[in-house]
Curated annotation (Swiss-Prot):
Residues that bind ATP: 569-577, 591
Protein's UniProt keywords contain Coiled coil: yes
Name of the protein: Tyrosine-protein kinase Fer
UniProt organism field: Homo sapiens (Human)
Top EC class, one word: transferase
Gene behind this protein: FER
Biological process terms in GO annotation: actin cytoskeleton organization; adherens junction assembly; adherens junction disassembly; cell adhesion; cell-cell adhesion mediated by cadherin; cellular response to macrophage colony-stimulating factor stimulus; cellular response to reactive oxygen species; chemotaxis
Lineage: Eukaryota, Metazoa, Chordata, Craniata, Vertebrata
Amino acid sequence: MGFGSDLKNSHEAVLKLQDWELRLLETVKKFMALRIKSDKEYASTLQNLCNQVDKESTVQMNYVSNVSKSWLLMIQQTEQLSRIMKTHAEDLNSGPLHRLTMMIKDKQQVKKSYIGVHQQIEAEMIKVTKTELEKLKCSYRQLIKEMNSAKEKYKEALAKGKETEKAKERYDKATMKLHMLHNQYVLALKGAQLHQNQYYDITLPLLLDSLQKMQEEMIKALKGIFDEYSQITSLVTEEIVNVHKEIQMSVEQIDPSTEYNNFIDVHRTTAAKEQEIEFDTSLLEENENLQANEIMWNNLTAESLQVMLKTLAEELMQTQQMLLNKEEAVLELEKRIEESSETCEKKSDIVLLLSQKQALEELKQSVQQLRCTEAKFSAQKELLEQKVQENDGKEPPPVVNYEEDARSVTSMERKERLSKFESIRHSIAGIIRSPKSALGSSALSDMISISEKPLAEQDWYHGAIPRIEAQELLKKQGDFLVRESHGKPGEYVLSVYSDGQRRHFIIQYVDNMYRFEGTGFSNIPQLIDHHYTTKQVITKKSGVVLLNPIPKDKKWILSHEDVILGELLGKGNFGEVYKGTLKDKTSVAVKTCKEDLPQELKIKFLQEAKILKQYDHPNIVKLIGVCTQRQPVYIIMELVSGGDFLTFLRRKKDELKLKQLVKFSLDAAAGMLYLESKNCIHRDLAARNCLVGENNVLKISDFGMSRQEDGGVYSSSGLKQIPIKWTAPEALNYGRYSSESDVWSFGILLWETFSLGVCPYPGMTNQQAREQVERGYRMSAPQHCPEDISKIMMKCWDYKPENRPKFSELQKELTIIKRKLT
């Protein structure tokens, strides 16, 4: 197999091959040039980062820190990586790229040489085998005519007896020319035959084989170039691997348990002797009736001591109850953190638990403070009880002197203690609250589908809906539906309302048959149809009978097969978000729910869809449907082309005009006014949770934290992760969410909008921002922000919720501002 033996008549294909290879080499050359540029820029960026860090790290703590050592080594190794990448880029330029450029020129020369030789030998072959033979054949035919003419004239001369010799001479001459030409033709024909054989058997194959040899040599050269490129650009070379090994080793040397040992040694202070708190006996120098550390029981104090004892007993009991609640909250949070820790996939996922761990430590501090208060109240109560019991049944002795002073002092002490208790009681009030479920319900009524339909097509099959949502759908005796277990994918459950209770029966699958406790069936629809039509009890013990199938809301239910997942758009709180396509070619956004999420998070995932089902507004992201027929569950939303508002602001900051920013704010106000009218509290209003659609229409999105409350107020335990910089003080302090707290968040959204995507409270941590707000601090308006907008922000950030404007007022004010800019 080879060019010479198999490609004799494939000249055009060979030319196309060479053209294609030249284009490929040009593409490779362009790619390598861009790779060199990219690597140089990457190396330069790394070096700039290291230089910047060096400037910012000039101030060092005066103790030895393993974290600092590790960080310093990471910077040093990053600098080393920068130098390596720069060297690699230079080697790539002087090596593979330079050789590839030379090879392209050689390739072009080979092509040119091949075309020239091929044209030459082909022209020679055509000349010998066609052109020259055709000329001889034409002359041959002409001489035959001339000879025949001379022959006829010779015969005529013989017949007439005139000029016979002359005619004979002409005849002989014509015959001689013909015979000589005949010999030339025979020789030329023989030569043409041999030339043709030589052309196809030797000359052309030799040219093609020569071309193939050069082609293969160039492939060999290209392979060498690729090999050198691979070695130079490899990220697993020994020098690069060593860089990362050094970094990894430095990270492994970080030991949280010993990190602060040196710091403690450097800054250790000797324990100061505690000052003893004793009764100041100098107070008694001018009074003989009072004794140090003794409760005075007499006719003036006996009654007040009883009141104080009763008050202290009540205070102690309340403190003990608070302490019990706090300790339960500690145990609950510890359990929650432990469960979350088990689901962490990466070491860095521990960051997600830090806020919860901080909340746990704060709870423990509160517990300790309450224990201290309990011990104090107990000691005070014991002291009072001892004095009261000592004098039980006795008549209080009279006080001769300073009755009024004694009464005043006693009264003041009582007031001080009561005041102190009140301050303690108020400081710990509202810490422990129970979260409320906010899942709604929907009314459904339809008849059962025939058992021949697949399970997913049965009206009474609701897919992987949460247990609590299934229970809300069951209202009357005999109401039933089938669902996939939310906690155990692949397991199916029959949910029934019977005798005032909502019962849940796992559908058993044994020996390829579905059953409860009686007859088995090959599929679930047949099993349910049997119990529904025959009214046979589900189990003898329960006596439950199926009467009313509860159909699913078909308006929103989609099949997984109706959606084709496309590119990954990003990651949400519960799973990935993809671009998808419906059967009618509609582009949508598909939110997925990870199958390994805890049950409570899966319920929250579907909560967003349940809320959005009820809404239809141009400034609220639209729900298309949900896919709950099997795991993983999908929420299908309209695809909003502009992406999230925060990224949009940062990307378009040089293009956005003031009028457009006001329009965005007005859109947000309109959307929130609509939500307020539906008694919906968003709880997480921020630029990152808004989307920008066609014609720059802003839409409120991400209802994962939202709640619907008839009273317009939602209480939270306060132990969950919340967006602190966007959340109102009353929500942070007491877990009280309302439309007024959403107004506070709207003010932060305004600040984000007119700062073009800057993070609120720049330079502050969450805790610092929270403390500053409590002290009365409010962010100043962003640069170029209109004064009217700044005033609206300040109104939104009024500490008292009742003083904040309504969304209807905000919409009116923003409309006026927009008109002024027109």
